[in-house]
């Protein structure tokens, strides 16, 4: 089958491939310590589920406006204002089929062939391919473990050219958990103002940050609106990944363009899911602190466990629910090497140790592995024991 150059520029999500391989082994009865999925293991809160049931019972199952039902387009800016001190109106909000869809739509209306998008690495797996699909080129700016994988304005400035149209900042970050502090974020915003560039702030993990960090949005900065696009989602904060509701907050002309492209692709997000999201936005936030408390325990367990493995180093994530250890000591051609690449090593770990994780190459970070600790302490302990045993008996394992 002859496919377009556009589709040939992108690849299937590497995380989806890892999940698929792990599921195949699970189907054969193999017990897998699964650190692959990037989603909360908590259920959607009951009050949100009940709102969806009520919507079904009230027959709210028809088409809705493409950009979302009016109450939700009012509730999202109001929630964002309460939680993150921004100031958006309903006309500056578009509801999308998940946060990824908001990113896709925004990139597609902002860039064209030959444009550049600055992307700090390690990056979320879908960013480069969305940029390429839109015809633009990702310009990668490396972050460093010793700075907590936090993007720096000075590094971004060096990458800006006349072709730069967007800078993407995902904070807290998937895959590293790195977070950009408010002062640094404002320096990045100042750069974007200076060069007339859009700053896309992916805030999908905004409420999962660890002391001393606090939830932050660059949209709270003075006069930020003209250069900022906020991307958000109910997926992580409210454990609603499968409901597929995200949003964009931006100046009205950009929102109108996002709604236009959505009108010719998905049309409206699922009506029932929108009413569930409406309850999430209007209802209690009491379910978030217990989730964060549990992630805090898991973070401590997994980072300390990884650091106890000889040859492995791991920074403390500032947010999200991922550990991102450096395992480069076990890669290459040397006598202690287990594989040439992280991708090869992750396959070995799945096949030999029955541990599923995502290789760093997927995130533009060879030499690293991503482990999601959105799983129980008991399963974290099982996985850590298997990893420790694998690396301790490396020659036998290979």
Q: What feature does the model see in each segment?
A:
Residues 2-98, 105, 134, 280-283, ...:
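N-terminal small-domain helix-loop-helix segment of the aminotransferase-like
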Residues 18, 35, 52, 76, ...:
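Generic structural signal for small/hydrophobic residues in well-ordered secondary structure
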Residues 78, 82, 157-158, 335-340, ...:
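PLP-dependent enzyme catalytic core of the Aspartate aminotransferase-like
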Residues 109-131:
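Conserved PLP-anchoring active-site segment centered on the Schiff-base-forming lysine
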Residues 133-139:
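A short helix-loop-beta submotif of the ANL/AMP-binding
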Residues 139, 143-216:
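Active-site phosphate-binding strand-loop segment of PLP-dependent enzymes
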Residues 221-296, 300-309, 390:
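Conserved core segment of the aminotransferase class I/II
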Residues 278, 293-303, 314-333, 367:
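Conserved glycine-rich beta-strand-loop-beta hairpin in the small C-terminal domain of fold type I
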